[in-house]
From Swiss-Prot:
It comes from the Eukaryota. Pfam families: MCM, MCM6_C, MCM_lid, MCM_N, MCM_OB. This is DNA replication licensing factor MCM6. Belongs to the MCM family. Component of the minichromosome maintenance (MCM) complex, a heterotetramer composed of MCM2, MCM3, MCM4, MCM5, MCM6 and MCM7. Keywords: ATP-binding, Cell cycle, DNA replication, DNA-binding, Helicase, Hydrolase, Metal-binding, Nucleotide-binding, Nucleus, Zinc, Zinc-finger. It is an enzyme of class 3 (hydrolase). GO terms for biological process: DNA replication initiation; double-strand break repair via break-induced replication; mitotic DNA replication. SMART domains: MCM. Its EC number is 3.6.4.12. CDD domains: MCM6 (cd17757). It is found in: Nucleus.
């Protein structure tokens, strides 16, 4: 350095400035006609920006000495690099008709510089004092952001003794005054007044960055670091983003050490005359002396650029932009669009995309299809009153242990750019929604984001959902339907966005799912939570030799060959691009699809009101909205801009397989049907007890097997059908019994034939049968159900056998239609 006009000139920094200016003038990409950063100036003009983004890879290709100087001593050369950018901008504006970036009205306007694409990413734990002043890049998760406040960059001070003005006093990470007045006759060192109108301020924001989960060593807690954002990069990082910050490490005074109780390490010169009469040293007077004598410093990261880790922001699937900026909208290149169209034209592409979801898990196609539709989502809408209509799809997976529920959640959290994985057992209401914390420096209360806020515009995966406390489950009611979080705490009243899809996993209450009971008895979840899920899937671990063989073969093959064992049709990168492109579409409902939607909803409501129907929860308008969202997601998966009736039918099928047939286990009635179609029963036996022939073991042989095959056909009905018929018959018998008791005369029971005729007439009045064959088949099923209710379940009892008139041979035969039935007094309807 040499003295020049009373000031020292940094010759090395001046040379770096000139070389960097030459780089901006001359650097060209291969086969490019004009300089690369001349086109960058055009982009700066279009977005009215004062920040020039420089690719550090270009600097490395241009001059190795320049890149080494910038990397090693960035903090020293940073003002000179900004000055080079300003000179480059001033050169390019001459002789042009375009609006200049720096106008004549504001010649002191600064041009900021932002580097990106640094080759080596540092881990947060590697940032120490050795990195102070160097240009580095670090990746982490943003956990907290402060409000944007003004920061003093260069101050203009007025001497209170002589009135002299000192300009351009650079601030050194704290309030910095001139050391001494420049007036030779004035020796003022402490009496200064800041002239705010002539000082230079900029936007300032502090962001808390935390290590990513992959970088945390075993047995260690995640570390955090404060990141300082300035100028135009404020509000670029949001809580929950995984971000790459480029900048330098700086040592800043620790304000918390000043305010905390106890002794502080302080550097001072021994001066007896500065002690007062009691021998006690003077205290720190305000923040002016902060950092002057205190030895309490901490590391902070001063960033010059912010880059989302996955290279691009997620698609905004709402009508408005994420931050109200058109530049944030997803843009696809022609190559990416061609690749998406190629995937769409692959034969049977939908099933291949479903198979590409979580390929490490064998089978479970319905759940994979639900996860794909959840990743795509429906179309978000806003009413004229400003009410948001949810477009995100919520999915709940209930299943036995070791059914790969957590693997589905982990995979989904990894494929989405903005996602949060948490466990319900260890999550509180504040941890899921938001909490109010105290700002360490200002002492004011601020809102710290919870899991649902961090997953805004993404997916929140909650494992062990049933293990959450009731008060914690209530906290997410609003977030699941209105997609907002309302907070009224510590003087803060705010409504925060939680526009996220929820993928939850829960275990049955008894450890295993009991198919004989409805879903509400198997899962410890209230109906208010269950109704907010669009799809609820049950995973039951049943022994099946064929399925078990294929699962074992798949798992062993994955352990043996790792990635080679998995050969999905589309890779994860292709799947991400396809989903991102499909989410940018906003399909509209066609008139034909509207008709199918209305008819399907009416049919579902009619089935819900049928006695004995066993569904996961009641059919409400929420399920109609779920059908709309699923139809739009299916249309997106096919890259259609219009929702077709076929999409609606597929959505109805998904809804039926998830919540209506959730307990659709089969009931085998083959042992309870009569060989002669159930018209006669042997006279020597009590109808309420099994016959001796039934009790005696049958001899094995081809004759007996043939007789069994010809005498009885296999009769299997669904559990829902069985329960519906059972409850209808029991209710009719109870009504008859009450009427007889009230009148005081008549028989308490009903004839079986009259009971069957009543049920068939009731169903026929509702249009349940279309032919005589269906009626005969239904009568056969009802007879078998009655036999089971008498012989096995004991829900019905036989009061009288009801002997029929003598036949031609003079023998009296008992018929099942003529016997009198009643409800067992100990039976209680569920």
């Amino acid at each position: 350095m040499e003295a020049f006009g009373g000031f020292f000139v940094d010759e090395k920094a001046a040379r770096v400035e000139n070389i960097f200016l030459e780089f901006l003038r001359r650097f060209k990409e291969a086969d490019a006609a004009e300089a690369f950063y001349e086109t960058e100036l055009e982009a700066m003009r279009s977005r009215e920006s004062t920040t020039m983004y420089v690719d550090f890879a270009h600097v490395m290709r241009f001059n190795d000495v320049l890149q080494k100087a910038i990397s090693e001593e960035y903090l020293r050369f940073e003002p000179y690099l900004r000055n080079a950018c300003k000179r480059f901008v001033m050169e390019q504006r001459t002789g042009e008709n375009r609006a200049p970036i720096i106008s004549d009205d504001s010649p002191n306007k600064d041009i900021n510089i932002a580097f990106y694409n640094i080759p080596m990413l540092k881990r947060l734990r590697e940032l120490g004092t050795a990195e102070i002043g160097k240009l580095t890049a670090v990746m982490g998760v943003v956990t907290r952001t402060s409000e944007v406040r003004p920061e003093l960059l260069q101050g203009t001070f007025k001497c209170l003794d002589c009135g002299n003005v000192v300009k351009n006093v650079e601030q050194q990470f704290k309030y910095t005054e001139p050391i001494i007045c420049v007036n030779a006759t004035c020796q003022n060192r402490s009496k200064w007044a800041l002239l705010r109108q002539e000082s230079k301020f900029t936007d300032w924001q502090r962001v808390r960055m935390q290590e990513t989960s992959k970088e945390i060593p075993a047995g260690s807690l995640p570390r955090s670091l404060d990141v300082i954002l300035r100028h135009e990069i404020v509000e670029k990082a949001r809580a929950g983003d995984t971000v790459i910050f480029t900048g330098t490490v700086a040592a800043v005074p620790d304000v918390m050490a000043l305010t905390s109780p106890g002794e502080r390490a302080e550097c001072r010169r021994e001066a007896p005359q500065r002690k007062n009469g009691s021998g006690v040293q003077e205290g720190v007077k305000g923040l002016k002396s902060l950092g002057v004598r205190d030895l309490s410093y901490r590391l902070a990261f001063v960033a010059n650029s912010v880059q989302v880790a996955d290279g691009r922001r997620e698609v905004d699937i709402r009508d408005r932009d994420i931050d109200g900026d058109d530049s944030e909208r997803q843009k696809f290149t022609e190559e990416e669009e061609d690749e998406v169209v190629r995937m769409r034209n692959v034969p049977d592409f939908f099933n291949k995309i479903v198979d590409s979801i979580c390929p490490t898990v064998f089978g479970h196609q319905e759940i994979k299809r639900a996860i794909l539709l959840m990743l795509l989502g429906g179309v978000h809408k806003i009413t004229h009153e400003g009410i948001n209509l949810r477009g995100d799809i919520n999915v709940c997976i209930v299943g036995d242990p070791s059914c790969a529920k957590s693997q589905f959640l982990k995979y989904t959290a990894g494929i989405v750019p903005r996602s949060v994985y948490t466990s319900g057992k260890s999550s509180s209401a504040a941890g899921l929604t938001a909490t109010v914390a105290k700002e360490p420096e200002t002492g004011e209360f601020c809102i710290e984001a919870g899991a649902l806020m961090l997953a805004d515009n993404g997916i929140c995966c909650i494992d062990e959902f049933d293990k959450m406390d009731i008060k914690d489950q209530v906290a997410i009611h609003e977030a699941m339907e209105q997609q907002t979080i309302s907070i009224t705490k510590a003087g803060i009243q705010a409504t925060l966005n939680a526009r996220t899809s929820i993928l939850a996993a829960a275990n049955p209450t008894g450890g295993r799912y009991d198919k004989s009971k409805p879903l509400k008895y198997n899962v410890a979840l209230p109906p208010a939570i269950l109704s907010r899920f669009d799809l609820v899937y049950i995973m039951i671990d049943e022994p099946d030799e064929n399925t078990d063989y294929h699962i074992a073969h798949h798992i062993v093959r994955v352990h043996q060959k790792r990635e080679e064992a998995l050969a999905p049709a589309f890779s994860t990168a292709e799947l991400k691009r396809y989903i991102a492109f499909a989410k940018s579409l906003k399909p509209q409902l066609s008139s034909e699809a509207k008709k199918v939607l209305v008819e399907s909803y009416v049919t579902l409501r009619r089935g819900d009101s049928t006695p004995g129907t066993r569904v996961a929860y009641r059919m409400t308008v929420r399920q109609l909205e779920a059908l709309i969202r699923l139809s739009e997601a299916i249309a997106r998966s096919h890259l259609e801009r219009v929702v077709l009736p076929a999409h609606v039918r597929m959505a109805v099928k998904l809804l039926k397989t998830s919540i209506i047939s959730v307990e659709s286990s089969e009931v085998d009635l083959s042992d309870f049907q009569d060989a002669d179609d159930g018209t006669n029963v042997p006279a020597d036996n009590d109808a309420g007890q099994p016959t001796e022939m039934d009790a005696a073991p049958q001899q094995d042989g081809p004759e007996n097997e043939q007789a069994a095959d010809t005498g009885k056909k296999k009769l299997v009905i669904t559990e829902e059908h069985f329960q519906r018929v059972t409850q209808a018959l029991v209710m009719r018998l109870r009504q008859h019994e009450e009427s007889v008791t009230k009148d005081g005369d008549g028989l308490a029971g009903m004839k079986q034939g009259d009971l069957i005729i009543w049920y068939v007439e009731q169903q026929n009045a509702q249009g349940a049968y279309s032919s005589t064959a269906e009626v005969k088949e239904e009568v056969k099923c009802i007879k078998a159900i009655i036999e089971r209710l008498i012989q096995r379940d004991g829900h019905l009892i036989v009061i009288d056998e009801g002997a029929a008139p003598a036949a031609d041979d003079g023998a009296a035969r008992r018929t099942s239609e003529s016997r009198i039935l009643a409800v067992n007094p100990n039976y209680v309807i569920d």
